[in-house]
Amino acid sequence: MGRKIFISYKYSDSGVYPLNGNYSTTVRDYVDELQSKLKEGDHINKGEADGEDLSEFKDETIWTKLKDKIFDSSITIIFISKNMKALFQSEEDQWIPWEISYSLRELTRNGRTSGANALLAVVLPDQYNSYEYFIHDNSCPYCNCITLKTNTLFTILRENMFNIKSPTYNDCSNHSESNKVYTGESSYVRSVKWVDFIDNFDIYLQVAYNINENKDEYTLHKSV
């Protein structure tokens, strides 16, 4: 049986590395690249066009626009890109936070209930083929840990990272008590670089599904 995947992304963000030598590449091209590699039977629903003004919409109106795309999906992939977040616009007036919010809610339609989706954040390279805007590799010279710059994300996305209820940490003495390094699957929203994801996407989708099966171990934040 094919997977039903919802993809949330910033349509118009061109601050990404060119695909196949195309210097007008946008995030949408990365979505198309993934779609071309999925198995027959897998189905993708894409997020809303980001040019639409949400400021006058009520919650119910937003849900009406999203419900058919999200309700039947089992996993939501969020494409993280450098300019995904409009800095001078309220988060409530942007589509991505709402798409994440509804992906996390248990929803009922026509007597059938859909549980919270698995979530996976796929981090796209910026125009310089770098992931440093979000992922800092080897941030500690002793334990070679990775730092995720979650402060750059939408609030709902940030709050669903490092949100495991009973965290475990490594024993690196180079980190203070308030800056300990998490181990294991510490985030409900797992992050992966595009370069690692695209040729092994089945593995990472399964990781997200496994986390979802243990969602009670995480504090889920569902509000925009």
From Swiss-Prot:
Per UniProt, subcellular location reads as: Cytoplasm
Q: Which residues cross the membrane?
A: none
Its keywords, alphabetically, are:
Antiviral defense, Cytoplasm, Hydrolase, NAD
- One Pfam family recorded for the sequence: ThsB_TIR
For this protein, what is the EC number? 3.2.2.-
Give GO cellular component annotations, separated by semicolons: cytoplasm
Quote the function comment for this protein: One of 2 TIR-like protein components of the Thoeris antiviral defense system, composed of ThsA, TIR1 (thsB1) and TIR2 (thsB2). Phage infection activates this protein; by 70 minutes post-infection with phage SPO1, TIR1 generates a signal molecule that activates the NAD(+) hydrolase activity of ThsA (tested with B.cereus). The signal is similar to cyclic ADP-D-ribose, but how it differs is unknown. Expression of Thoeris in B.subtilis (strain BEST7003) confers resistance to phages phi29, phi3T, SPBeta, SBSphi11, SBSphi13, SBSphiJ, SPO1 and SPR but not SBSphiC.
Family the UniProt entry places it in? Belongs to the Thoeris B TIR-like family.
**Protein name stated in the entry:** Putative cyclic ADP-D-ribose synthase TIR1
Q: Which gene encodes it?
A: thsB1
